Structures are given as C-alpha cells and as structure tokens.
Amino acid sequence: SLRRSSIDFKFLSFQNPAFKNRKKETKNFLILLAPAIIGNGAYQINLLIDMILASTLPDGSISYLYFADRVNQLPLGVLGIAISTALLPILSQHVKERNVIEANASISESIKFGIYFSVPALVGIFLLSNQIISFLFLRGEFSLEDSKLTSLALTALCFGLPAFILIKILVVPFFANEDTKTPIKVSVFSMSLNLILNLILIKEFLHVGLAIATS
C-alpha cells in the first residue's frame, strides 16, 4: 500500500549518500553519548544501590526511600534539568565562537540561579517534610509511622538538593566542550563514595543512613 501511495523511503536507506555523509557525525555522537548517560545517571545508579541495600532492612524501607526520592525529585527535575537544558545551547554557541568571557558569565548566572532557588527549596522541605509526606501519602495502608519514617528519609535527601541541581549545571560546560571523560570520572568516584558510606551508615541509621550517603 505504501508503494501504491508513491511514498519514497529512500531517505531511510543506509546506501543513501546523505546517510553516508552523516556516518562520522553519528559515530562521534554515539561515542559521546555513552559516557554522558553514565555521567548524568550517577544519581539514579546511587538510588538503585540504595534500593538493593534497603531490601536487606526491615519491611517498608524500600518504600520509604522511594517515596522520599519522588518528592525530592520535583525541585531537582524542575530546576536542575530546566536550567541545564537552557544553558547547553547557549554555552555551546559561546564555545563554538571561542567567547570565553560570555561562556563564563552564562555558567556563573546559571549557578547563581540554581542556588537562589535550591536553597529555599531545601529549607522548605526540611521544615515541612513531615507535613508534605503526610499530605501526599498518609492514607490506606500507609500509616502514621510510615509517614514519619519516610519524612526522615526526605529530610536526609533534601540536604543534597543544591548539590544535585548544581551537578546538572556544572556538567554542561564539559559536554559543550565534548569532554565526557571528566564527568564520568567524577561519577565513578561519587558512586564509590556513596557505596562506602552506605555500608558504614546503614548499620546505625538503617534506611535514613542510605539517604544520608546519597546526599
């Protein structure tokens, strides 16, 4: 039916000259992509490690960490991802034009913007963690004790919020310069440190210790 409609799909062919011309660019993109995924995914990998270790703790520990992380992800997603997404094309253009002064100014403004919004978010979550968790989850099988234990995990996680947001911003200059090695080195160090702190803090503070290690 597609042939009868005279629709030309030659542009999808690997023999298409346009595809061949883009082969080098595509290869470079894929080379840069893998480290970027690992560099940006360090937080999620740390969270996965937390969940695995939480499975060895009393029932409910995984849920406490998961719900606390969902709440903590809201300002992280809104601020960190939004700022980094807006910064990347601007910074890439400055790098392309070799405009170091404007590039540094853009980075500085983004960092200031991230701090201005993340610190109040941290304070708000710290002061209202119990109320936030109770409002969102205190119903059905989710008891008052569950709410308290989840709010403790949220309180621990929120202290890392400014750093989480700044990380999203600070990796942008490296990606704009096509340097994916530095972020991945930092990510590997971060994940190693998180694992060590997990093993130390889990004994005394249980699931809250895992949240502290992540922060």
Predicted regions and their residues:
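Membrane-embedded alpha-helical bundles of multi-pass transporters/translocases
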Residues: 1-215
